[in-house]
Amino acid sequence: MDKFRVQGPTKLQGEVTISGAKNAALPILFAALLAEEPVEIQNVPKLKDVDTSMKLLSQLGAKVERNGSVHIDARDVNVFCAPYDLVKTMRASIWALGPLVARFGQGQVSLPGGCTIGARPVDLHISGLEQLGATIKLEEGYVKASVDGRLKGAHIVMDKVSVGATVTIMCSATLAEGTTIIENAAREPEIVDTANFLITLGAKISGQGTDRIVIEGVERLGGGVYRVLPDRIETGTFLVAAAISRGKIICRNAQPDTLDAVLAKLRDAGADIEVGEDWISLDMHGKRPKAVNVRTAPHPAFPTDMQAQFTLLNLVAEGTGFITETVFENRFMHVPELSRMGAHAEIESNTVICHGVEKLSGAQVMATDLRASASLVLAGCIAEGTTVVDRIYHIDRGYERIEDKLRALGVNIERVKGE
């Protein structure tokens, strides 16, 4: 397995161009199965999960090409089963199920894999499809969905806020007969982006970005060209990297209005932040950040995917900060690894109490999930000496060319090929 070797400490300075959002690109790629004409999707990041999704769409019979943009022609889809060998590495493949059953009346997806963060059941996807009239069976490790004729619009109240299930229900409802209302819907920018993509193809959707989404079913969806929004988590990760290194950075191709909660906390930590239409600058003026208290919750609150990065910020900040995780259990696996680098933290149920230290020391650490592993790489950027981060395949699932982007900001980082 590949590793990163990072020599620190470095003060990050310069510009970084933000990639398209993985968490919008994936649902949009699967939503392309609904289209009866070719679609072009721009600003799709080059990531392992994206490659896996494109491979999966090809196996279903879609024509998929990448030349800058991703081109998908799903007219000839004739296989309705997403097999285990592709699904096992990636939870997002569950998003193939709704479009398949909505357009073709049948679909089956192997139960998914992905990051090992807490319980992420597919129950909410299943109950949403059942409420739209699909028959669901769980057999031999597969979720099998079918419907006679079209799905039927329904008034669906989500038991809990779920980005994944909101995507499944919204995509499926675009081709259902009648109107679907989703109450307690997820409000994430990636949901809005997926809805806007579907609207480009001819879907009738309103209320995306609120907790009540209304979808009027249409007979068919056509083609179109759509640009994926910038990755707010990648943006936030680079902003934190600059903040903890007391540096100065400009993020280009960013979307500031998707990061309100994160930018507010960075300002609390002492960062001087300016924003334009598609850029964000951060300058620490050489100062050490101040500890901040953070509580994760569904959008528009503070995102769970930025929790590990802010845990690290607090561990090198002035003072003591509390980080409370309310979205996923089992999401503090980076904390013991950071302790090996000299960090002082205590975990009490779903809260980490961070006591800031002046500096970290390089160490050998291991990545456990996508965002935790990013925080270990950032720790290596500011630690004294050499840090080796093992199991970085987690990072490759969510960050495009992170080492090249860090190098351009002055970091001494190299990828060491594994056995």
UniProtKB/Swiss-Prot annotation:
Any single biological process term in GO: UDP-N-acetylgalactosamine biosynthetic process
Pfam family, one: EPSP_synthase
Subcellular location: Cytoplasm
Pathway: Cell wall biogenesis; peptidoglycan biosynthesis
Classification via InterPro entries: Enolpyruvate_Tfrase_dom (IPR001986), Enolpyruvate_Tfrase_sf (IPR036968), MurA_subfamily (IPR050068), RNA3'P_cycl/enolpyr_Trfase_a/b (IPR013792), UDP_GlcNAc_COvinyl_MurA (IPR005750)
Keyword match Cell wall biogenesis/degradation: yes
Catalytic reactions of this protein: phosphoenolpyruvate + UDP-N-acetyl-alpha-D-glucosamine = UDP-N-acetyl-3-O-(1-carboxyvinyl)-alpha-D-glucosamine + phosphate
GO cellular component: cytoplasm
Binding of UDP-N-acetyl-alpha-D-glucosamine, residues: 91, 120-124, 160-163, 305, 327
Keyword tags: Cell cycle, Cell division, Cell shape, Cell wall biogenesis/degradation, Cytoplasm, Peptidoglycan synthesis, Pyruvate, Transferase
Protein family according to the UniProt entry: Belongs to the EPSP synthase family. MurA subfamily.
Function comment: Cell wall formation. Adds enolpyruvyl to UDP-N-acetylglucosamine.
Protein's recorded name: UDP-N-acetylglucosamine 1-carboxyvinyltransferase
Organism: Shigella dysenteriae serotype 1 (strain Sd197)
Gene name per UniProt: murA
